[in-house]
Each structure stands twice: as C-alpha cells, then as structure tokens.
Amino acid sequence: MAGSHPYFNLPDSTHPSPPSAPPSLRWCQRCQPSDATNGLLVALLGGGLPAGFVGPLSRMAYQASNLPSLELLICRCLFHLPIALPLKLHGDPLLGPPDIRGRACFCALLNVLSIGCAYSAVQVVPAGNAATVRKGSSTVCSAILTLCLESQGLSGYDWCGLLGSILGLIIIVGPGLWTLQEGTMGVYTALGYVQAFLGGLALSLGLLVYRSLHFPSCLPTVAFLSGLVGLLGSVPGLFVLQTPVLPSDLLSWSCVGAVGILALVSFTCVGYAVTKAHPALVCAVLHSEVVVALILQYYVLHETVAPSDIMGAGIVLGSIAIITARNLSCERTGKVEE
C-alpha cells in the first residue's frame, strides 16, 4: 500500500502538474495563530490593558469624593446585570444549568471577592503596587493549582517567562514592603497588601473553577452571576461596614462609569482567554496591567515611581514577550490529499 501514499507517488511526465499557488497564498492557507496564541493576545489587549486603568480610576474616585470600596463594587456589578437580556432572548437559564449551578455561583463569588479585595487595597496602597501583588499571587497560585489539580504542565520557555514576570513583580513591590511606615498607617498599608494577595488567590481559584464549567452560555452566565452575587453581598455590607457616599462632582461619576465599562470588557476577555490557554500564562500576560497602572500612577495621579518600578516593569514586559513569542505557533489547516 506504500505506492498509494502521496509521498511515494512519482510525478507523471505525461500529465502536466497544476500551477502552484503563490507563496503568500500557501502561507495563509497553511498557517494561522493557534488557540493559545489567540487567547493570550485577547488577554493582553482586552484583559490587561483595560484593567490597568481600573485601579488608578478607582483611586481617583476615592480621592475626589471618598467613595467607599463596596459602593464602587456595587456600581461595577450594575454593569453586569444587563447581560440578563441576551440570556433571556436566547432562552438560556440566568443561573446556568441546574446540575452545575452551584459551581457557577461559587465562581461568581470568587470573582466578587477578588474584585472587592482589589478595590479595598487600591485605597491604601499605590495602584501599581496593588496590581503587582494581586497579579503576582494569581500567577503563582494558578501555576500551582493547575499543575496539581489538572496535571497541565508548562514548557521551558513558558516557565522562563512566568518566573521572569514574577521576578519583575518582586522588584516592583519589594522596596515598598521593606519601608512600611510604623504606626496605624503602616498597619493599613500592610493590610492593603494582604488584601491584594487574597484578591489574587481568589482570582486564580475563580479561573480554575471557570475552566471546569462546560455549557454554551458559560461566559455570559458567570458574568451575570458575578453582578448578582456582588450586589447581594455588597449592598448590606455597605450599610453595615461603610458609609454610603453620593458623589456630587462629574469626575467621580466619570471614573465610576469608566471603571464599570473597562472592568466588564476585561472580565469578558479574560473569561475567553482562560479557555484557550494555560491559566498561569493568562495571568502572566495580564501583568501588562501593572505597567499601565504604573504609567497612570506617575502621569495622572502624580505619585512617585521608583527606579525599581521601572526596572521591574521592563522585566515584566520582556517576560510577556517571551511567553507570547513562544506561543506564536502555526497550525496546519490544510490536509494532505490521499
């Protein structure tokens, strides 16, 4: 049967061979970005970059009108509720299929806890440092949890980029941890870093639970549940733990609206990306949020950016480049005729 294999057929001189396609056409037909590459690019452009604006804008809203973190979380959750409309139009259950409804609600709860910790941390910790600790802890926890629970390993280049990004985050946040002020302010700052770490841990757990959900309307259902669970938990907590504030200036309302829109875009893109690529790599690419937050921290909030911040941001960008270049693979789309 070897003679019938296309690799063993000799060219027939009596029948002219068909004209070959142009090289550019053959390349387009033969190669396309892999699913992992598409996921990482979506996480970079749609997840990390918009999320980098969320922390500084939240801090601006707090500085302008002392907007509590739970009130900001409520405003963000309100942007998730309109997702119920397309779910109802398609006839999908708002809370997901009955057999996995519990896991979907648990995933939404983890997302809300992660967001709430992030908003609380950014009020007492510089926006860049809060994003650094949150993304660093989410990356490490995602790598460990995925390796232990899903037995999904990483290549050498992926580990190089992953460890490099974590090193960059340590360089950014390390000096700030060693120079904490004594007294009440130092305690609040330390608690802010702890909240940022817990936010990253909740984020990694939420991504892992989300990957275990398999039904057609998974992403919009979890997005709607995140808004619903966030409202049910934040509204009572706001009146018990904090004092509601009604912003009276245009800047605060603009920041709140921008935070809601950008956060929803980032949430959607990360939810798509984590189904295409390794969760740890998605979290590592999301470190671009730190770079954006540091830029806004310096130019918009006029807060100090140390040389170590610039050095760490450069290492983070280099690590993201390594991970992205490693996953810029091509998939063969055409099949060999037999």
From Swiss-Prot:
UniProt keywords, alphabetically: Membrane, Repeat, Transmembrane, Transmembrane helix
Transmembrane residue ranges: 37-57, 67-87, 105-125, 160-180, 190-210, 221-241, 250-270, 281-301, 305-325
Main location as per UniProt: membrane
GO cellular component: membrane
InterPro entries per the UniProt record, alphabetical: EamA_dom (IPR000620)
Presence of keyword Secreted: no
Region listing for Disordered, in residue ranges: 1-21
Compartment annotation: Membrane
Sequence ranges assigned to domain EamA in this UniProt record: 49-174, 272-325
Its membrane topology: Multi-pass membrane protein
Miscellaneous comment as given in the Swiss-Prot or TrEMBL entry: The gene encoding this protein appears to have arisen by SVA-mediated retrotransposition of the SLC35G6 gene in the primate lineage.
Family: Belongs to the SLC35G solute transporter family.
Protein name (database record): Solute carrier family 35 member G5
Organism: Pan troglodytes (Chimpanzee)
Organism phylogeny: Eukaryota, Metazoa, Chordata, Craniata, Vertebrata
Gene: SLC35G5
